[in-house]
Amino acid sequence: MSFIAIIPARFASSRLPGKPLADINGKPMVVRVMERAQASGADRVIVATDHQGVVEAVERAGGEVYLTRPDHQSGTERLQEVIDRYDFPDDRIIVNVQGDEPLIPPQIILQVADNLAGAEAGMATLAVPITTAEEAFNPNAVKVVVDARGYALYFSRATIPWDREGFARSREHLSHSLLRHIGIYAYRADFIRRYVSWSASPLEKIEILEQLRVLWYGEKIHVAVSSVAPGMGVDTPEELAQVRLLQQQLD
């Protein structure tokens, strides 16, 4: 499988300022993510950042990095600048690896690239089963509903599908399967170029979910169930502390 992994690494973060450079047992977070992506078998791994400090950290670690404009509204827009700068061909598979996933299993990165290659869709992603009621009703856990062939019908922060009879009896136990979306994407370069030309959709503004723009404009997203459990992401100081402990066990 031939693909390029790009890691958008925006320096500003409302809940964890300077997140890409946060130290995780002797290495910046962005370097931890880069090393995971390099282990996936990607032909090339590029960090895309708006901050010179991140550029220097990646270069010190021997990685490839590109300094983007600071005014991008999303990670996908940052990707688009990179693919245009390097003039990647339209059919090149690009995997968007989130810059705050220092424990992401390399297998997931390869799997989402494989998923796109075998699907009739402009975009591919992954999901995992939801096993607890707490997660099912957590708006920070994005749910996805798919059709019989695995193509996304809708993504939502709400609990979908809603089990009318089951939840009427109890909301403590799940009587049907739900899927939680994992924020990793694969697309071909031409799809990214088209995506950034579309205006933001009403649904994505309501849910604050960028992927809803794809469905709004009639495109398909294929969703596969992840082959392994995803690693823990980092959005808060508390999560950073947890990831440091987990990484210590791996080092």
UniProtKB/Swiss-Prot annotation:
Its main location: cytoplasm. One of its GO terms (biological process) is CMP-keto-3-deoxy-D-manno-octulosonic acid biosynthetic process. Gene3D superfamilies: Spore Coat Polysaccharide Biosynthesis Protein SpsA, Chain A (3.90.550.10). Keywords: Cytoplasm, Lipopolysaccharide biosynthesis, Nucleotidyltransferase, Transferase. Its EC number is 2.7.7.38. It catalyses: 3-deoxy-alpha-D-manno-oct-2-ulosonate + CTP = CMP-3-deoxy-beta-D-manno-octulosonate + diphosphate. Pathway: Nucleotide-sugar biosynthesis; CMP-3-deoxy-D-manno-octulosonate biosynthesis; CMP-3-deoxy-D-manno-octulosonate from 3-deoxy-D-manno-octulosonate and CTP: step 1/1; Bacterial outer membrane biogenesis; lipopolysaccharide biosynthesis. SUPFAM superfamilies: Nucleotide-diphospho-sugar transferases. GO terms for molecular function: 3-deoxy-manno-octulosonate cytidylyltransferase activity. GO terms for cellular component: cytosol. Activates KDO (a required 8-carbon sugar) for incorporation into bacterial lipopolysaccharide in Gram-negative bacteria. This is 3-deoxy-manno-octulosonate cytidylyltransferase. It comes from Sodalis glossinidius (strain morsitans). The lineage of its organism: Bacteria, Pseudomonadati, Pseudomonadota, Gammaproteobacteria, Enterobacterales.
